[in-house]
């Protein structure tokens, strides 16, 4: 007769089940970490999109300013325009001088500058913001690439 202990195979099975449980738990943790990383990347993408949208809004405003400035310096002297005074209200005003522009220099400080100088300053701000936008778009592209690399791993690990 065999002197084998009948409880031995049960212990082996129990140990094997315990090991599978540890691996499953480790797999669950890995999936959770991958999902957390994915959520973080998606949040960063959303933040960058918001930043790009804000930069685009400022660029659009600057282009509009440039367009109005160009028109007024060429055609505006003596014209009557509607000046916004807030809350959808306007007042008529006659343009007398198109040679200078009052421009904000920050901190509630404004400065009177020649129109051509104001135009150059606006163009310079547009160029700088377009560089910022390009940098943000590159970062967005990189994050999208990371998400596209991570998604298959999340699906693969999550399916196990």
From Swiss-Prot:
Q: Which GO terms describe its molecular function?
A: unfolded protein binding
Q: Which InterPro entries match?
A: PFD_alpha_archaea, Prefoldin, Prefoldin_subunit_alpha
Cellular component GO terms, alphabetical: cytoplasm; prefoldin complex
User: Keyword annotations for this protein?
Assistant: Chaperone, Cytoplasm
The record's subcellular locations are: Cytoplasm
Q: Which SUPFAM superfamilies match?
A: Prefoldin (SSF46579)
Share an example GO biological-process annotation for this protein.
protein folding
| Keyword RNA-binding annotated | no
* Assembly and oligomerization: Heterohexamer of two alpha and four beta subunits.
Which HAMAP family does the protein's record reference? Answer: PfdA (MF_00308)
Functional description taken from the UniProt entry: Molecular chaperone capable of stabilizing a range of proteins. Seems to fulfill an ATP-independent, HSP70-like function in archaeal de novo protein folding.
- What protein family does this chain belong to? Belongs to the prefoldin alpha subunit family.
Q: Per its record, how is this protein called by name?
A: Prefoldin subunit alpha
Q: Which organism is it from?
A: Ignicoccus hospitalis (strain KIN4/I / DSM 18386 / JCM 14125)
């Amino acid at each position: 007769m065999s002197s084998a202990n009948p409880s031995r195979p049960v212990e082996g099975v129990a140990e094997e089940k315990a090991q599978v449980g540890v691996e499953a738990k480790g797999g669950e943790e890995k999936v959770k970490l991958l999902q957390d990383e994915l959520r973080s990347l998606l949040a960063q993408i959303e933040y960058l999109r918001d930043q790009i949208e804000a930069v685009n809004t400022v660029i659009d405003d600057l282009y509009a300013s440039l367009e109005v400035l160009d028109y007024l310096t060429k055609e505006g002297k003596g014209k009557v325009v509607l000046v916004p005074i807030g809350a959808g209200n306007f007042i008529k005003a006659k343009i007398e001088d198109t040679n200078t522009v009052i421009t904000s220099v920050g901190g509630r400080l404004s400065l009177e500058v020649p129109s051509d100088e104001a135009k150059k300053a606006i163009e310079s701000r547009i160029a700088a913001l377009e560089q910022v936008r390009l940098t943000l778009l590159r970062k967005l592209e990189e994050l999208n690439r990371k998400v596209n690399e991570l998604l298959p791993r999340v699906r693969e690990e999550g399916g196990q």
